[in-house]
Structure formats: structure tokens, C-alpha cells
């Protein structure tokens, strides 16, 4: 998300895409932020996830200057309630200087027939960031739904709306609308494969400092599609990302050429217990 913050000074933060009931989407792949865990009845559950990625991408924009990232989370669920903490290293090339991102999130996931709703709040924090000129930390609210297709077995889809009254970088009110889908493929050897993808649009206001290209363009679109391979407690994800921003560089979302264009990303993680 820090790209937006840059516009206030002259990408990230970390997603939850709608928490879809399909296993692949529940793993958080294909979306914009850390995904909420799937609740299983009225009992207290705790899980820990550790992983790494070749490039930490948030809503189509690299958060690590196209470098690898180590990531982890701790998630708690009780009935329809969930809460968690997620962390990753970041690198905005000193614009501003930041080394770590820590996200806190909580919400409710009630169901109504075949539909699962996700109502939550996320707090994106950048400890020790040199961001006195434009505050990186921000709060985002989300409301979304997901459901399994009644016509196509193994297909799950949904949409989530995110809203922040003051987006990271002090660029004012920003909305993000994201749709996602997952399709479970037949078992392949020891792997449980699935295809997942997401398509989203970020809307801001150039008058408040949110600029995509340094002018009055204040919205952009991102998308991704990938293959997730699950085996035991491990998941391996191969994903293609792109945006309609291209190689725009300057006082806008991208601080350097190549941070907002197409890329392939590999992610591996393990979830315990």
C-alpha cells in the first residue's frame, strides 16, 4: 500500500480478501490482505502460520522492493468471532524508511443459508517507521460475503468492500472493492490443488493526495490468478500479479520502476497445529 503514502510525501500495508470458504481462499492466497480464519463451531481454536514469499505484493504493488519476505501469523477463532496478528518485513526504499509491518485484525463471520459474511476491522502498523511527514499506520473496515456455487461443485466466490477514513500516507478516504474466486481441482498425487484469483479496484481522491500517476488519476485496478498446492499442513502457491498502472514512477503509488507491473510470485507456508 505504500505507493499511496508516497503521493502524500511527493505501497502497503498488508488483506484481507473476503474470507472464502474454499480451502485455498481460506489460506489467504489471491487477495489483498491477510485472510480471516474459517470458524469451526463454538470452540476456541488457535493456529500459527509461518511462511515466506519471493515478493510481498499487496493489491498489486510490491511491498518489499521486489525482494523476498518472511511472514507469520497467529489466529484465534471462537464460534463466529475471529482475531489475529500478522507480520512481515517490508522495504519502501526509504520512501519512507520502514522495516516491518504488523497487522492486527478482528471480526465476525455469521452465516445465512449458504452465504458466509465477513465483517471486520484491520489495523496496519509500521513500528519504528520514519514517517513523520505522512503517517503510515491506518485503520480499515471491511464487509464482504462468500458462498459455494450451487451449480459448479468446488467453486467458491465472493466480494469484499474495504474502507478507510484516512488511508496510509495521510491521503484521505479510500475504498477498495475486491472480488475473488477459488476452484478446487481433483486430487493430484499427494497434493490438493486449487485455482484462485482476485480482481479489485482502489478508489481515492486526488484532492486529498491519493494519486496513481502524479496527476488527477485517483483509482487503479489490480488482479491475480494462481495455483495453490496443499499437502498436509503445507501450502505452495504460484501466482501471477498485474495492475493497470504500468511503469508510472514519481510522486504517485510507485516509487520505482517495476513495483506496480506484472510479476510472478512464489509463496510457501505451514500452518500449525
Q: Which residues are covered by each model-predicted region?
A:
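Short glycine/proline- and aromatic-enriched beta-strand/turn motifs that initiate or cap beta-hairpins
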Residues: 27-91
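Transmembrane beta-strands of outer-membrane beta-barrel pores
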Residues: 52-58, 78-80, 87-91, 110-112, ...
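Transmembrane beta-strands of outer-membrane beta-barrel proteins
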Residues: 46-50, 72, 81-85, 104, ...
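Cleavable N-terminal export/targeting peptides
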Residues: 1-45, 272-273
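Short loop/turn motifs that connect adjacent beta-strands in outer-membrane beta-barrel proteins
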Residues: 33-45, 111-116, 148-156, 169-171, ...
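Residues that define the transmembrane beta-barrel architecture of outer-membrane proteins
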Residues: 42-44, 66-70, 98-102, 115, ...
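Outer-membrane beta-barrel "beta-signal"
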Residues: 231, 258-273
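Outer-membrane beta-barrel translocator domains and adjoining extracellular loop/strand segments
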Residues: 58-65, 93-100, 129-136, 168-174, ...
